[in-house]
């Protein structure tokens, strides 16, 4: 039982959560302007509105322009506050509720994007960690932070695994119906973009790619037990997978891809940035953190608190003038 608890709630640095909060709340601001950006204009067409199951269960009111504009303003303010790790519980849960409703409206007009699942889960679990003392520079570790990150990791992986199950279900619960179909060829013909239009002449290659993607999604749960370099290779594989889908279909998975940061040791980012700043100061000839520079006219103080004479620092021009006056 203890092993199960440790797996679901490992003790990890809280700074990892603080950094991930900043990144994800900033991404939400990007998302509502680039990806799910149409709830306000869509709310002007109530006749096209077909609410999702979640909306029906929660009995949420139908969208209107005042409602969607209010959600937009709440998301703007809430994300700015939460990204700064201020009022993490209040701002975090407000953003989670507003963004869930916002995306539910945007996806109640005929198209549901499953790439937002991990992001929505992340917004709901990150506020549970509460205040992180020291924010990015925190040295505290807790199981609360580990539980939140594990939830995000599970949501990321299940984005792929549930996609594979959906393919099996839509094919009559057959393991071969989807990968043996011509769905990828059909998708490219429907939207001939990028590299995809050059692959139309190779339907067998496209079928091999379908099998590869299907098996990768079906076995994606293995990622949850990987560590070290194996985990890094898995993350790079899925990033490459998303780059490939963009190049052949112009379909991105940015909300899922950004949530892969839940697997990363983000706590190393703060010390790394401090080292970079220290190196730049050294190259510029200035003092690094914790050091002081000599100032002309200052006197040193010995261990007994008495002043001793220190050699003064002169400018090069003054040195040349003095040298010219000496015999």
Language model features: what each stretch is:
Residues 1-326:
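Alpha-helical membrane-anchoring segments
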């Amino acid at each position: 039982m203890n092993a199960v608890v440790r797996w679901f709630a490992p003790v990890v640095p809280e700074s990892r959560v603080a950094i991930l909060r900043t990144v994800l709340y900033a991404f939400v601001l990007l998302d509502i302007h680039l990806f799910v950006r149409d709830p306000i204009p869509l709310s002007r067409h109530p006749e096209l509105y077909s609410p999702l199951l979640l909306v029906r269960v929660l009995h949420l009111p139908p969208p209107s322009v005042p409602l969607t504009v209010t959600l937009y303003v709440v998301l703007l303010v809430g994300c700015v506050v939460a990204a700064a790790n201020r009022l993490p519980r209040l701002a975090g849960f407000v953003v989670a509720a507003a963004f869930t409703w916002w995306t539910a409206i945007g996806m109640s007009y005929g198209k549901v994007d499953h790439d937002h699942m991990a992001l929505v889960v992340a917004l709901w679990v990150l506020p549970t960690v509460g205040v992180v003392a020291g924010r990015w520079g925190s040295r505290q570790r807790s199981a609360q932070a580990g539980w939140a990150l594990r939830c995000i990791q599970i949501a990321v992986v299940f984005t792929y695994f549930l996609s594979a199950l959906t393919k099996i279900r839509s094919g009559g619960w057959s393991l071969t119906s989807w990968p043996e179909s011509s769905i990828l060829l059909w998708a490219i013909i429907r939207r001939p973009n990028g590299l995809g239009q050059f692959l139309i002449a190779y339907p067998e290659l496209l079928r091999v790619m379908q099998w590869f993607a299907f098996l990768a999604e079906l076995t994606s749960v293995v990622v949850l037990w990987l560590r070290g370099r194996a985990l890094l290779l898995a993350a790079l594989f899925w990033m490459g997978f998303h780059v490939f889908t963009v190049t052949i279909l112009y379909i991105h998975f940015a909300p899922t891809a950004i949530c892969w940061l839940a697997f990363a040791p983000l706590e190393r980012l703060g010390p790394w940035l401090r080292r970079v700043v220290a190196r730049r100061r050294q190259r510029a000839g200035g003092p690094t953190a914790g050091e002081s520079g000599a100032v002309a006219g200052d006197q040193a103080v010995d261990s007994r608190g008495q002043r001793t004479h220190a050699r003064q620092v002169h400018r090069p021009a003054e040195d040349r003038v003095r040298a010219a006056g000496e015999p």
